[in-house]
Amino acid sequence: RILYKCANCHEEGFMKGEGITIKCHNCGKEYELDELGQLCALRGETEFLHIPHWYAWERECVREEIINDNYLLDTDVEIGVMVDYKAIYMVGKGHLTHDKDGFVLKSYDGELNYSQPPQASYGLYADYYWYEIGDVICIGDKNCLYYCFPEKEGVVAKTRLAAEELFKLTK
């Protein structure tokens, strides 16, 4: 899930890992992780020998999208809210966007309209298959945390990178 962008065809959301292999289901390029922790393409060129180098390339791609005003997360979400640090209360569906101006979360019932500028936080709490519910992006402040479970698959890693890069670009 961290390697969401194919190093060969540059498409996003088609990378799937299983065991020691990761494969792009768009172009078919497949890599295997060897006993030394290096990636090896099963056919053709190995673009990145090490996972951190691939991840750094993804970060640079996101940064370029932001600079060129092409970055946008736009997805429907299930919304969980934590206000008392005791439990997360699932409150319904909504829509989450993230761009150069930060996050905007709106519930479909109109009860929630939260925005968070890029300067609110350097990092983003995001996790994969969180408590077996699903991938999660968490935004909020000291008063309330919003746990957003995106309907779109494979957006969490890119969103985390984008939040970090937006913070750096806007400070």
Residues of each region from the PLM?
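Cys/His-rich short segments
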Residues: 1-45
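Short, surface-exposed beta-strand/loop "edge" segments at domain boundaries and coil↔beta transitions
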Residues: 30, 87-89, 107-114, 141-155
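Acidic, Ser/Thr- and proline-rich intrinsically disordered linker/docking segments
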Residues: 118-171
